[in-house]
Amino acid sequence: MKKILFLSLFLMVCTILSAQKRVKVACVGNSITYGYTLPNPATDSYPSQLQQLLGETYEVGNFGKSGATLLNKGHRPYMQQEEFKKAIAFAGDIVVIHLGINDTDPRDWPNYRDSFVKDYLALIDSFRVANPKCHIIIARLTPIADRHPRFESGTRDWHGEIQQSIETIAKYAGVQLMDFHEPLYPYPYLLPDAVHPNVEGAGILAKTVYSAITGDFGGLHLSELYTDNMVLQHGEPLAIRGKANAGEKVTVSIAKQKLTAKAASNGDWAVTIQPLKAGGPYTLTVSAGKQKQTFNNVLAGEVWLCSGQSNMEFYLSWSKTAKRDIPQAANDQIRLFDMKARWRTDAVEWDTSVLDSLNHLQYYKDTEWTVCS
């Protein structure tokens, strides 16, 4: 009996300690944070999806208020809402703020724009008072699509002005800046009503916040343009850039040059190599942590970008002199990165799978640099 009682008490203490160790994340915002227009905000909103990504060691609170403005003289000031009071009481260890979309309303920004920075700083200070050790992340605004009824009557321009203000606030307040705009901007279908993300869009926001909190950006990543047989521009300083987990040391080596960089809080890193002498072949290596990517048979030379219409796709094998010309084409000093369309733009109906791929910007087939032959 004593053993059972001791075990029960032990498990109870472990449970309490476990609960105390959970990192609290307060998601502060408007209807986009709340999950307005989603089938089930309780499971589909970005804070709910963020909870799934972070796991049981985190507790994510959704304090989104539909229609809320950042401006304290706006038509629905966030700091006057019940959600704000609950967010303060929550005293999050991490506070994620996405406000400003509703401030593009003609009732707000034209009249009270000069108070935006002051009011945002006051909001930040409120959370710092509630938890002096909290880490605050503020987000650049999600896009507003051109289908919005007020897009060309001020909303587009005011949206841009607010973005600039948010960037200024991040620097002045010493808080982490996160981008909610770039991940959604290329995909209009993610914003069915021009403002609110669908479930997939909310998932992208959740992943963005997850990376901002954990620094996990999926490890070392470079553009698809980096492959074996590639050509780098010779004779001038050249930037090599990519993604890595935040804070990770990245090392780039080529032609007896070895450069290092530290991935920023958004995962971006870049180094600038000194001008390469024309020729090669060179070997380019990029490493971060336990990951390493090696690109062989790299040349330094002239890089030409060619784009155009159907005549750019004309195959040499289609020409009348193909049999004579093709044998003369072999030249290992010439390389081609040929991006071929996945689907023809002929007068045919595409099925839904094609439309889905196009919506995800999958226009071209996977390719790599090849040696001319």
Named regions from a protein language model:
Residues 241-321:
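Extended acidic/polar, glycine-enriched regions
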Residues 1-21:
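Bacterial Sec-dependent N-terminal signal peptides
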Residues 327-344, 348-361:
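C-terminal catalytic domains of large/alpha subunits in multi-subunit enzymes
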Residues 21-27, 32-121, 157, 276, ...:
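Conserved SGNH/GDSL esterase-like catalytic core that processes O-acyl groups on lipids
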Residues 228, 236-240:
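Structural beta-strand segments of beta-rich domains
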Residues 357-373:
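A conserved hydrophobic secondary-structure block that centers on an alpha-helix together
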